[in-house]
Structures are given as structure tokens and as C-alpha cells.
Amino acid sequence: MKLSSTAIALSAVLALAGCDNSAVISPEQQMGPDPVLPAAQNFLMPPMQVPKGVGWQQNQMPKVAEGLKIDKVADGLLHPRQLLTLPNGDVLVVEANGPGTEAVSTPKQLIAGLVKGQSGKGGKGGNRITLLRPTADGSWEKHVFLEGLDSPFGVQLIGNTLYVANTGNIMQYAYQPGETRISDAGKELADLPDTINHHWTKALLASPDGKKLYVGVGSNSNITENGLAVEYRRAAVLEVDTA
């Protein structure tokens, strides 16, 4: 089905018009054995209020159970997805963002993107790895460890080799303990399925002997709507030799 840009835009405007409807019944009135219910209405798109994404305020912290303590280690991270603690105590933070490789071809896709964008938190991720290092005074240093990645997710260290699972491949880099930035250009260990990429994250786990890597590859669809051919090596855990 081909849709003109005018038709898609008009559908989006009409649908988003429903997002401006505000609830006139308080939450308290909607609770209990005899709640107040609004009259039934038909909408092109149900009314909704998309909450705005906000960060922690100054000195604001999550609440933890009694006996536990929580401290801020780092801020300003761009879509952090995975953590890996290195043998020397450094912590790697994988910052990623979806590859956005699927073309918008239906009103549903366009509307979904516009609604999600109302949260204000849809900015691009760092596509990098940040290194956090604890110091003697209890603070943490923050360094850009590796950048220029392609929607990274999984990361593993085997000996002095760092493996990073991008959305389309596994890269390996020479690592020296204690360094705060990878200088090695890296090389590709294995390619991974990455089209169209509905489920793009690639989790990574090393075998105990370090000879194998296991990478989780998500399916390319929810109900094989793109056909079985594009599901080859997807919805699977792939085994990769490190040698």
C-alpha cells in the first residue's frame, strides 16, 4: 500500500487532535465501588496525556529500602543500556539508540512516532561506551571510552580483548587495563542480522573459558508480518568462536 505524504500528514493531525482532550473526572472520582464514568464516545484516536520525561532534580534520589544507601555515580548519559564492571573496578556504560532503519509507510507508524515524541525524550543516543572510575574521595571520573558505534548493546571482556555487539556486527578491540580510552581501531569478528531491525538490541555473553560468545538476536517482527525469509538467524542465540 502506497500512501501520499498529504494523506499521512492529515491522518496524523486528526489522530493527534484526540491527544489534547483532558480528563474532566478526578482520579478520586474514578475509584471505589461506585466510580464516576464518562459518557461513551467514539474517537479516531483515544484521548491521552503523554507524560513529559524529566530528569532528577538537584539532590533528588530514588528511595531505597532501610539499610541500603544510594549515591549518584554519573549523569548526562545518553540512553544507557548495559553495564560491565572491569577487573580493576572501572565500570563501562553502553549508551545506544535505535538504528531507525525502517521506513515510515503507514499512518500508524507516523502517528506512533509523533505521540512518542511528545515525551521530549526521544533524542539520539550517544552510540558510545563511557568509562566510570571510582576515586579515593568517593567521587567518580567519567571518560568517553569508545565512540562511533552502531547502536551498541552487549559488551564483554575476555583477557585483553573487548567485544562490543553493535546492531549489525560484533567488534573486537585491544584493551589495556587502566586505560580510559580505546585507541585501537578494532576489527569485525562476526556480522549479525540487522535488517529491518524491529528488535535491534544484541545481548552478549562470554563462555566461562572465553572461547565462545553467545549473542541474542531478536526477531524481525511480532507476528512474522515481514515474512519468514527475514527471520533467518533471528529470534535466536548465536554462538560465535572468539579464536
Predicted stretch roles:
Residues M1-A7:
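Bacterial N-terminal signal peptides that target proteins for export
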